[in-house]
């Protein structure tokens, strides 16, 4: 959607049940960041393609693995096990979890264990003021 002076921004449609969803990738000076936004299972293939080889994948982590979150939320969000699968399939270098609910915040160890079943790269939780690159 944008390309100028080495900065390239790419976007593809995600899927968040009946709400609009967009997945973004930003490439600049040999580095890349992909932002999942809120997506459900129907957006996973698009996210995996656009995130391929990203240095950082920022993934919204709003639910726990089934059945530990309200069932209706799984039609809107991606479970930790799937976050790990997508991160591994896209071969991303690092994962940053954002859009954290209170349940997620209270279950960080379980969340990381679930992701680690398929993704072995660094996993970090977003917080106010966090800087990921100098």
Write out the residue ranges for each language-model feature.
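Core dinuclear metal-dependent hydrolase active-site scaffold
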Residues: 1-52, 128-134
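Cap/insert and terminal regions of metallo-dependent hydrolase folds
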Residues: 41-130
């Amino acid at each position: 959607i944008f390309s100028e002076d080495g900065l390239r921004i790419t976007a593809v449609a995600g899927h968040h049940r009946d709400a609009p969803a967009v997945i973004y990738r930003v490439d600049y000076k040999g580095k890349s960041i992909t932002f999942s936004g809120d997506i459900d299972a129907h957006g996973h293939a698009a996210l995996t393609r656009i995130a391929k080889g990203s240095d950082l994948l920022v993934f919204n982590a709003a639910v726990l693995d089934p059945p530990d979150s309200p069932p209706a939320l799984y039609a809107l969000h991606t479970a930790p096990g799937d976050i790990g699968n997508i991160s591994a399939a896209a071969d991303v270098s690092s994962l940053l979890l954002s859009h954290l609910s209170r349940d997620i915040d209270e279950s960080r160890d379980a969340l990381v264990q679930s992701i680690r079943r398929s993704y072995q790269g660094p996993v970090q939780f977003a917080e106010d003021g966090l800087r990921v690159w100098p």
